[in-house]
Amino acid sequence: MMNWQQLLSDRRVGAETRQGGGGDYARSEFERDYDRLVFSPPFRRLQNKTQVFPLPGNVFVHNRLTHSLEVSCVGRSLGNMVGTALQRKYPDLGIDFRSSLSAIVSAACLAHDMGNPPFGHSGERAIGAYFTEGNGLQWREAVEAEGHRWSDFTHFEGNANALRLLTHQFLGRRAGGFALSYSTIASIIKYPYSSECAGGHGKFGFFQTEEATMRDLAEELGLIRLSGDDEPLRYARYPLVYLVEASDDICYQVMDIEDAYKLNILSYEEAKNILSAFLDESERVYMEDLFRDITDANERIGYLRSRAINALVEETAQIFIEHEEQILSGVFSGGLLSKLSEPRNSAMKHCSQVAWDRIYRSKMVIDMELAGHRIFTSLLDKLLHALAHPEHLYSKALLDRVSSQYNVHETSCYGRIQCALDYISGMTDLY
């Protein structure tokens, strides 16, 4: 069983033996993680990356940056609630445990989408399709002949790419990437297994190049290994991942409804009914009374959204505490939100169904997905040809455009593909 004393580690990736720098008495190590992320260029670039809807014209909807900030706020609240309960249960954890846990979850929430390519989740699908059924298939034999994992590309995953972005030493950069704490890094790894375990769902947590980093994290934090010596690497989740995942799910499920209302995809009555379904009967009665004074429709939807999130956060924290032993033992299955009680369980399922039927399959979202597929295909065709044939005149001009932190002189086919994906996934929708 995992234990909290070992799970909270301020050891930094890539800085394990580094000396000097002095202490920072104004901030904890985990608060430094948060600040380091906020001040980083990759985090700022999230403002020009799509969340669900195309980047706005006259109506401002969520992008990756605003979504990540909101997820971080929810994560902070969940961390505080869970940390308080655990500190009460285990007094030996110390007075800083609650604040440390909250800071870790909040920082991880900021970072959870930093590995996602442009055009939302459709960008991930476009990259996977390129190597599954597109022109990228031509490189499969070479990658496998090198002993590398082709599945790293056919199942391209933003979560695995975030781990690479945050920990890999790119050219001219320091060891350990962002040099974040082990606990913060572990909190973003939703799928702690290799792409060989991805199967039909296509999810995994680390590329072959980051497998050693995953092993180091697991050893330092005491994660439970689920795979045998001769099997693809697989671990039980780091416990705080459940809080990061829940924060993300709460925000995108609820906020997508508000955005859809603002874009007139959902009517006021539809949005109101979806959001109010998360509330208990007594709170719905109070809400109707309050709405006699609040006549602005946008204000009403905003209020309902905040109450729905609050109700979900409070119950999610309780679910974590109730299942803490299963989580620490590595046997908890599903996400925390799958254990919601009524009426929130039915409300969440209905919210997800409406989102799929009316939002994710809406014309504007489908048009963006088609555009992303076309753009990614063109970019990958040109970049991979240039990387394979750098002596060509056009190739040299194209590779000169690639940031110097990416190694365009990679000799392996796997390395060249990773170079192209590092560059493309760091782009914004507008780039």
Question: Locations of the language-model features?
Answer:
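C-terminal subdomains that position terminal phosphate/3'-OH groups for nucleotidyl transfer/ligation
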Residues: 281-415
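Sequence-structural signature of the catalytic-core scaffold of metal-dependent phosphohydrolases
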Residues: 1-26, 38-49, 58, 69, ...
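Charged/polar positions within long, soluble alpha-helices
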Residues: 80, 167, 252-255, 259, ...
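A short small-residue
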Residues: 49-59, 354-359
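Low-complexity, highly charged intrinsically disordered N-terminal segments
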Residues: 62-65
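Acidic, low-complexity proline/glycine-rich segments
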Residues: 31-44, 340-346
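Amphipathic alpha-helical core segments of compact helical bundles
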Residues: 124, 128, 132, 314, ...
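Acidic, carboxylate-rich catalytic segments that either coordinate divalent cations
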Residues: 1-23, 377-386, 394, 398-431
